[in-house]
């Protein structure tokens, strides 16, 4: 045996690194990707699933990248996407709320406190908008997979799942604050006669009004009393988007 090889084997044994018989060594590819272990396979998605659906938004796209390795273009199965999206949304909103609550108790002058409250309000409004966008993206998958033919039931299931986030529970459960825009009675959509352009235009208008309502509620809660509320502006916009 060659002297160098014998020395390498001896050093490996002394450090407890002796190779086990039958062990396959994993090496990184040219792109830095680690190959999958034998026997580990992702569940195969349905053949026609996702053909009529919109592409994922940024938060859900990040979720899909976490489920599958880079460089693999796979359609997520319905159950995986629905459960994963709710968990991802819940985790993201909770992290946002923790950072907001931490910044809501600073020590400093009155001006610093006022500035911190403004930043907290902006953070919560941004979180509310992302919340609604995720709900909007989750709805088409739910209406096609959970309750086809019943858009109202699908919407109820989406909001029921999304309201897991504690800070937004009051918004999704309070029908008084929604006034002319009620999430429990959205624009009528039927998958049997699905018109994507008209349907999503109606839903865009519906969610814009919801987003403005949520923004008004959060801004009134955290903003200073000297700042004029945005309620009048959102009321005009809601009236423009809601059919009479």
From Swiss-Prot:
Biased composition (Polar residues): 99-110
Region (Disordered): 1-54, 99-126, 219-244
The keyword Disulfide bond belongs to this UniProt entry's keyword annotation: no
UniProt entry tagged with the keyword Transcription: yes
Cell compartment(s), UniProt: Nucleus; Cytoplasm
Keyword annotations from UniProtKB, A to Z: Activator, Cytoplasm, DNA-binding, Nucleus, Transcription, Transcription regulation
GO biological process, one term: inner ear morphogenesis
Start-end of Basic residues biased regions: 116-126, 234-244
Tissue: Expressed in neurons of the paraventricular nucleus, thalamus and occipital cortex and in glial cells (at protein level). Predominantly expressed in dendritic cells. Detected in brain and skeletal muscle. Highly expressed in mature dendritic cells and at a lower level in immature dendritic cells. Expressed in paraventricular nucleus, supraoptic nucleus and nucleus basalis of Meynert. Strongly expressed in paraventricular nucleus of depressed patients compared to controls. Not expressed in monocytes and B-cells.
Highest taxon listed in the record's lineage: Eukaryota
GO MF annotation, one: DNA binding
Gene Ontology CC: cytoplasm; nuclear body; nucleoplasm
Feature: compositional bias, Low complexity: 219-233
Function: Binds with and transactivates the corticotropin-releasing hormone (CRH) promoter.
Name of this chain's protein: Dendritic cell nuclear protein 1
Encoding gene, per UniProt annotation: DCANP1
